[in-house]
């Protein structure tokens, strides 16, 4: 971003570049009001320029070009520095969504002194001018990209500074400890009880625990917003695809009496009471595969099981348990910390399944009559506990960049603790604490890292 002058006035289309009812063009910078006054005329008095833009006011304006030819009738919204998104004077033009009008208006702004904005440059200016931090900027991008209600909510919480406040608390704690260390260094002769290595280590442990909580809570929030992974396993013709279709309430998977219809896994997203689930219908579970394709399908089914949060183990209740059923049960018993729901399918037929499953959560289902469907949906919902939703409402998520810094912060805290335990000189301990402070500062962008910042804003769309 440093290749662009922050003093420039920038303009960009904020809506898609296509024919539509309306289009919004945004302009920000010190010359925004001046440029707007050159091309904006009162719609009911086209010979009079609008040159007294007020804060948070709207104007019905006629846009005219340098030859005094009308371009469009628009709504002009004016917001004055510093109370804007960019903290700069900002003008927004709401025009008709003709590509001809969009091009003409953008060309007029550029001819009169504006510059076409770079990707994410409006958000970049909000960051540079202290309006938002890096974490908030990334949350704006996440909100734009969100594909479910929980993702949008989590992005808004983060955009409003939830993570930054947590990081600020950690850094404040470090700074308070540094003050004690520097006080001891500067006034060693003063006999006070304000400093001790034990007290310093205790404080490091608190900071460490807080970072660990941020990371672990983030994982739980991420599980919710990314979709709870549900793998459907079972032998061939147990009714896995029928269960898959029943949950979706539509015919997504091909259902057939021919063994091995599903060779690879199918996947779909579904929302149950606004909670996203990611369903995976897998290939039939065999003890012995007949060919390489079948073997690959079984391996992929196992991979889905390993990566899932919930496993739906489907058995044909109208048939005697066979070698493949027993093989599946043994596979499931070997898994650790898995939430498994056992389904006896075809409950509308005579029950013949004769294998006992110890301590199992078993649901009898008929995909023909839909009997048992409500119990299955309820069991899926029960996976999300009240504590999960409580954490979602109070905590936030971290992205890969933030997680990397937080994990590095944990390593740096261990160095601080080690040197304090071994009574290193306070100068050395203070140096390690400053490194820790800078690492955490990088999470919210309070420490400048130009290359990283440029990469973040380059991912934004133009006009944001």
UniProtKB/Swiss-Prot annotation:
Q: Which CDD domains match?
A: trmE, TrmE_N
One function term, GO molecular function aspect: GTPase activity
Q: Which of the seven top EC classes does this enzyme belong to?
A: hydrolase
Q: Where does K(+) bind?
A: 237, 256, 258, 261
Query: Mind telling me which GO cellular component terms the entry cites?
Result: cytoplasm
Supply the InterPro entries for this chain.
Answer: G_TrmE, GTP-bd, GTP-bd_TrmE_N, GTPase_MnmE, MnmE_dom2, MnmE_helical, P-loop_NTPase, Small_GTP-bd
The chain positions of domain TrmE-type G read: 227-385
Q: Any binding details for the cofactor? A: Binds 1 potassium ion per subunit.
Q: Where in the cell is it found?
A: Cytoplasm
Alphabetical keyword list: Cytoplasm, GTP-binding, Hydrolase, Magnesium, Metal-binding, Nucleotide-binding, Potassium, tRNA processing
Q: Which positions in this protein are listed as binding Mg(2+)?
A: 241, 262
Q: Where does (6S)-5-formyl-5,6,7,8-tetrahydrofolate bind?
A: 26, 92, 131, 464
Q: Per the entry, which co-factors are needed?
A: K(+)
Q: In the Enzyme Commission scheme, what number(s) does this protein have? A: 3.6.-.-
Instruction: Cite the binding residues for GTP.
Output: 237-242, 256-262, 281-284
GO BP annotations listed: tRNA methylation; tRNA wobble uridine modification
Give the function comment from the record. Answer: Exhibits a very high intrinsic GTPase hydrolysis rate. Involved in the addition of a carboxymethylaminomethyl (cmnm) group at the wobble position (U34) of certain tRNAs, forming tRNA-cmnm(5)s(2)U34.
Similarity-based family = Belongs to the TRAFAC class TrmE-Era-EngA-EngB-Septin-like GTPase superfamily. TrmE GTPase family.
Subunit structure and binding partners: Homodimer. Heterotetramer of two MnmE and two MnmG subunits.
Q: Which HAMAP family match?
A: GTPase_MnmE
Instruction: Please name the NCBIfam families in this protein's record.
Output: mnmE_trmE_thdF, small_GTP
| Protein's recorded name | tRNA modification GTPase MnmE
State the species of origin.
Brachyspira hyodysenteriae (strain ATCC 49526 / WA1)
Gene of this entry: mnmE
């Amino acid at each position: 971003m440093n290749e662009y002058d922050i003093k420039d006035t920038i303009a960009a289309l904020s809506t898609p570049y296509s024919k539509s009812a309306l289009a919004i063009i945004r302009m920000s910078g010190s010359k925004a009001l001046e440029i707007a006054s050159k091309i904006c005329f009162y719609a009911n008095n086209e010979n009079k320029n609008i040159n007294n833009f007020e804060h948070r006011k709207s104007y019905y304006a006629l846009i005219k070009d340098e030859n005094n030819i009308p371009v469009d009738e628009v709504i002009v919204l004016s917001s004055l520095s510093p109370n804007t998104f960019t903290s700069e004077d900002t003008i927004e033009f709401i025009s008709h969504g003709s590509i001809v009008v969009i091009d003409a208006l953008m060309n007029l702004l550029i001819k009169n002194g504006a510059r076409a904005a770079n990707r994410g440059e409006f958000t970049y200016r909000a960051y540079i001018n202290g309006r938002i931090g890096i974490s908030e900027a990334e949350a704006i991008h996440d909100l734009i990209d969100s594909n479910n209600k929980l993702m949008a909510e989590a992005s808004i919480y983060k955009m409003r500074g939830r993570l930054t406040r947590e990081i600020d608390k950690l850094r404040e704690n470090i700074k308070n400890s540094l003050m004690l260390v520097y006080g001891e260094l500067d006034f060693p002769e003063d006999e006070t009880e304000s400093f001790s290595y034990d007290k310093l280590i205790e404080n490091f442990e608190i900071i460490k625990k807080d970072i660990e909580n941020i990371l672990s809570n983030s994982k739980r929030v991420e599980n919710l917003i990314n979709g709870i992974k549900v793998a459907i396993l079972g032998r061939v013709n147990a009714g896995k695809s029928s269960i898959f279709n029943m949950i979706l309430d539509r015919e997504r998977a091909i259902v057939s009496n021919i063994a091995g219809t599903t060779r690879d896994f199918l996947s779909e997203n579904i929302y149950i009471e606004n909670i996203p689930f990611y369903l995976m219908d897998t290939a039939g579970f065999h003890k012995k595969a007949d060919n390489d394709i079948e073997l690959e399908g079984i391996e992929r089914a196992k991979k889905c099981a390993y990566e899932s949060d919930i496993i739906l183990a489907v058995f044909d209740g109208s048939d005697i348990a066979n070698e493949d059923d027993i093989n599946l049960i043994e596979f499931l018993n070997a898994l650790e910390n898995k939430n498994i729901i056992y389904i006896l399918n075809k409950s509308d037929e005579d029950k013949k399944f004769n294998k006992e499953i110890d301590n199992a959560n078993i649901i009898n289902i008929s995909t023909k009559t839909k009997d048992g469907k409500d119990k299955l949906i309820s069991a899926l919902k029960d996976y999300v506990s009240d504590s999960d939703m409580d954490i979602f409402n109070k905590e936030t998520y971290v992205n890969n960049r933030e997680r990397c810094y937080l994990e590095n912060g944990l390593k740096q805290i261990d160095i601080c603790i080690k040197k304090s335990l071994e009574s290193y000189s306070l100068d050395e301990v203070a140096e390690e604490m400053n490194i820790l402070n800078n690492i955490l500062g990088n999470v919210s962008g309070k420490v400048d890292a130009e290359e990283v910042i440029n990469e973040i804003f380059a991912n934004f769309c133009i006009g944001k």
